[in-house]
Amino acid sequence: MIQMQTNLDVADNSGARRVMCIKVLGGSKRKYASVGDIIVVSVKEAIPRGRVKKGDVMKAVVVRTAKDIRRPDGSVIRFDSNAAVLVDNKREPIGTRIFGPVPRELRAKNHMKIISLAPEVL
C-alpha cells in the first residue's frame, strides 16, 4: 500500500536508487497504490552517470509492496520492501534490467515488458 510521501527502492538500472511517491494516479480522490499501479515519483537518490538525476519527476510502476497481496486461491504474498520500476509516458521501462522478483499480478495490469525483463515471477 503506497501513498504520498512513501519512499521506494528502484528495481531497475535506470540510475535512480530511491524515489518518493508524490502522487497516486487513477482518480482525484485515490489515496493508495498497490502492485501494478502507476504513481508519480521524485528521484531522491541517484548514481552518477545514470539516465535519471536527483530531483527528476517521473512515472513509476509499483512492483513490490510490504503490504500483503491476496490472491483468489487464498494465498498471500508479501515482500520485504516497497519497490518500483521507472517508466516513460508510454509505460515502457526506462531501464534495461529489472532486479529481484515481481508478482504475476503485473500481467493482469498489462505490464508485459516488466514481466519479460524480470528474473523471477512469483
From Swiss-Prot:
It comes from the Bacteria. InterPro entries: Ribosomal_uL14, Ribosomal_uL14_bac-type, Ribosomal_uL14_CS, Ribosomal_uL14_sf. GO terms for biological process: translation. Keywords: Ribonucleoprotein, Ribosomal protein, RNA-binding, rRNA-binding. GO terms for molecular function: large ribosomal subunit rRNA binding; structural constituent of ribosome. Belongs to the universal ribosomal protein uL14 family. This is Large ribosomal subunit protein uL14. PROSITE patterns: RIBOSOMAL_L14. Binds to 23S rRNA. Forms part of two intersubunit bridges in the 70S ribosome. It comes from Chelativorans sp. (strain BNC1). The lineage of its organism: Bacteria, Pseudomonadati, Pseudomonadota, Alphaproteobacteria, Hyphomicrobiales. One of its GO terms (cellular component) is cytosolic large ribosomal subunit. Part of the 50S ribosomal subunit. Forms a cluster with proteins L3 and L19. In the 70S ribosome, L14 and L19 interact and together make contacts with the 16S rRNA in bridges B5 and B8.
